[in-house]
């Protein structure tokens, strides 16, 4: 079991990253909430992982902290919820936001997540209620290795990097991989895009606009 990786962040192609540890590059799929917390490329990053072995593939899912990984592991125990849908849930809301939805039976917020229909949302509320009854609100302040919090890092990246239209394309592709339809992804990105935005910021704002 691979539980944690620490190494140089080589690539970010949301929702996938490539992290090099001791000369080995690991492809890891992450929820957008975790990708927002990553440092710049060529910087050291630490991610917590969940390893899945299937007949046709070996897959690594990564998270910025143990809390997100814990919720991911609870989600994939729900009947009909696989890793892809669990990642979509965590990409659209934080762990505590999801827990709040469950505790308040807020089905309207959950059905807005791509891939979650009414029946799946109802099943999530029912099955997760008992599993989350002892969940404590998590006050997590993620800090990168250079002491910069994710919000500051995103702002600095937006100011310092020269952006091209590829960022819009990357954002659209990321939304498609999360289960949104082409029309939804195009419309959401177009509605939030401003010149100079990083792909991560475009994705984050686009997701907010659809919830």
From Swiss-Prot:
Question: Region Domain III: what ranges?
Answer: 163-211
Which N-terminal residues, if any, form the signal peptide? none
Q: Where is this region: Flexible linker?
A: 144-162
* Classification via InterPro entries: DNA_helicase_Holl-junc_RuvA_I, Hlx-hairpin-Hlx_DNA-bd_motif, NA-bd_OB-fold, RuvA, RuvA_2-like, RuvA_C, RuvA_C_sf
- Which keywords accompany this UniProt record? Cytoplasm, DNA damage, DNA recombination, DNA repair, DNA-binding
Q: Where is this region: Domain I?
A: 1-64
Record note on domains: Has three domains with a flexible linker between the domains II and III and assumes an 'L' shape. Domain III is highly mobile and contacts RuvB.
Q: Which family does it belong to?
A: Belongs to the RuvA family.
How this chain assembles, per its entry, is: Homotetramer. Forms an RuvA(8)-RuvB(12)-Holliday junction (HJ) complex. HJ DNA is sandwiched between 2 RuvA tetramers; dsDNA enters through RuvA and exits via RuvB. An RuvB hexamer assembles on each DNA strand where it exits the tetramer. Each RuvB hexamer is contacted by two RuvA subunits (via domain III) on 2 adjacent RuvB subunits; this complex drives branch migration. In the full resolvosome a probable DNA-RuvA(4)-RuvB(12)-RuvC(2) complex forms which resolves the HJ.
Briefly, what is this protein's role? Answer: The RuvA-RuvB-RuvC complex processes Holliday junction (HJ) DNA during genetic recombination and DNA repair, while the RuvA-RuvB complex plays an important role in the rescue of blocked DNA replication forks via replication fork reversal (RFR). RuvA specifically binds to HJ cruciform DNA, conferring on it an open structure. The RuvB hexamer acts as an ATP-dependent pump, pulling dsDNA into and through the RuvAB complex. HJ branch migration allows RuvC to scan DNA until it finds its consensus sequence, where it cleaves and resolves the cruciform DNA.
The name on file for this protein is: Holliday junction branch migration complex subunit RuvA
In which organism is this protein found? Colwellia psychrerythraea (strain 34H / ATCC BAA-681) (Vibrio psychroerythus)
What is the primary gene name for this protein? ruvA
């Amino acid at each position: 079991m691979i539980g944690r990786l620490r190494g140089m962040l080589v690539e970010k192609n949301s929702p996938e990253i490539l992290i090099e540890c001791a000369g080995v590059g690991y492809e890891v799929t992450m929820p957008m909430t975790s990708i927002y917390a990553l440092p710049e490329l060529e910087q050291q990053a630490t991610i917590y992982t969940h390893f899945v072995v299937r007949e046709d593939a070996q897959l690594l899912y990564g998270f910025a902290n143990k809390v997100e990984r814990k919720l991911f592991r609870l989600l994939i125990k729900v009947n009909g919820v696989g890793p892809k849908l669990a990642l979509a849930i965590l990409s659209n809301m934080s762990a505590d936001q999801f827990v709040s939805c469950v505790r308040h039976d807020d089905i309207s917020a959950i059905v807005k997540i791509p891939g979650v229909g009414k029946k799946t949302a109802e099943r999530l509320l029912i099955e997760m209620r008992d599993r989350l009854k002892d969940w404590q609100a998590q006050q997590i302040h993620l800090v990168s290795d250079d002491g910069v919090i994710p919000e500051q890092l995103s702002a600095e990246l937006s100011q310092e990097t020269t952006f091209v239209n590829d960022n819009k394309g990357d954002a659209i592709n990321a939304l498609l991989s999360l289960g949104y339809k082409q029309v939804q992804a195009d419309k959401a990105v177009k509605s939030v895009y401003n010149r100079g935005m990083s792909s991560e910021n475009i994705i984050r704002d686009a997701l907010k606009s659809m919830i």
